[in-house]
Swiss-Prot record:
Protein's name according to its UniProt entry: ATP synthase subunit b
InterPro entries tied to this protein: ATP_synth_B-like_membr_sf (IPR028987), ATP_synth_b/b'su_bac/chlpt (IPR002146), ATP_synth_F0_bsu_bac (IPR005864), ATP_synthase_B_chain (IPR050059)
Principal subcellular localisation of the protein: membrane
Keyword presence, Membrane: yes
Organism for this UniProt entry: Coxiella burnetii (strain Dugway 5J108-111)
Membrane topology of the entry: Single-pass membrane protein
Length: 156
């Protein structure tokens, strides 16, 4: 094998090229690769953190939804109890008012009954006095007595 000067020059140029490449090109290239690796790692870490936050947010939202449903059920139960209480109060008030009105009606009926009874007694007294006057004005015999009683009965 013949080593000539051109092969040595080519080897020297290659070594110089490798040296220059290692000094000027390789460091920025490794920095760019390292920055890219770091950027990808940061992106993956951020994605993992985002996934964890999403899971926490889902858990929290489920808890809040469960709590909201519980509160809604409690509010509905309270509203139903209040409505039932109001209905019962209204029923009791209506019963009391009905009993009061019935008592007032009974009192009014009793007053009307007593007034009618008093009026009837006045009329009977008037008729009895009128009948007694007629009897005293006439001579009393059996036939006239019967006729007078019939007249009084027809007037009553």
């Amino acid at each position: 094998m013949d080593i000539n000067a051109s092969l040595i020059v080519q080897m020297l140029v290659f070594v110089v090229f490798i040296g220059l490449t290692m000094k000027f090109i390789w460091p920025p290239l490794t920095k760019a690769l390292e920055a890219r690796r770091k950027n990808i790692a940061d992106g993956l870490a951020a994605a993992e953190e985002g996934r964890k936050e999403l899971e926490l947010a889902e858990i929290k939202s489920k808890e809040q939804l469960t709590e909201a449903k519980t509160q809604a059920a409690h509010i509905i139960e309270q509203a139903n109890q209040r409505a039932n209480h109001i209905v019962e109060e209204a029923k009791n008030k209506a019963r009391e008012e009905g009993a009061h009105l019935i008592q007032l009606a009974k009192n009014e009926i009793e007053q009307e009954y007593n007034a009618a009874k008093t009026e009837l007694l006045k009329q009977i007294s008037t008729i009895a006095v009128a009948g007694a006057q007629k009897i005293l004005q006439r001579e009393v015999d059996k036939a006239s007595n019967d006729r007078l009683v019939d007249e009084l009965v027809s007037e009553i």
